[in-house]
Amino acid sequence: MGQLKIKDKSQREGYKPNQAIAILRYAHISPLKARLVLREIHGKDVGEALYLLKVIPKRAARIAEKLLKSAIANAEQKGLDLDRLYIKKAVADRGPILKKWIPRAHGRATMVRKRLSHITIVLEEKPEGKEEE
């Protein structure tokens, strides 16, 4: 028997009204390479994170920048204050592995593994009293 699906978002586990989430599934980048970039922006303000992603010369930074802009748009849609947003969670989970065979000498073949990622960015509003100077 399957799990009962809850249609009301407020009853889902882990849902908070002051958060905005953006998820990219099956990204064609290794989780290890994506984590290198996501570790840099975790905990930062949204503006600072966007600047960092623009200057980091990695392909994962372009993917994360696009996903962060999507999360910001989701926050704007929910009516959150964009000036108080920070990155609460930025993770790259392992996705499926695409396998293909490359022919080699003497009738052999070697397997090439193309690793995919599921990247999640969660933005949250800073509480009113905890503003930084």
Swiss-Prot record:
It comes from the Bacteria. GO terms for cellular component: cytosolic large ribosomal subunit. CDD domains: Ribosomal_L22. One of its GO terms (molecular function) is structural constituent of ribosome. GO terms for biological process: translation. InterPro entries: Ribosomal_uL22, Ribosomal_uL22_bac/chlpt-type, Ribosomal_uL22_bac/org-type, Ribosomal_uL22_CS, Ribosomal_uL22_sf. Keywords: Ribonucleoprotein, Ribosomal protein, RNA-binding, rRNA-binding. This protein binds specifically to 23S rRNA; its binding is stimulated by other ribosomal proteins, e.g. L4, L17, and L20. It is important during the early stages of 50S assembly. It makes multiple contacts with different domains of the 23S rRNA in the assembled 50S subunit and ribosome. HAMAP family: Ribosomal_uL22_B. Part of the 50S ribosomal subunit. Belongs to the universal ribosomal protein uL22 family. This is Large ribosomal subunit protein uL22. The gene is rplV.
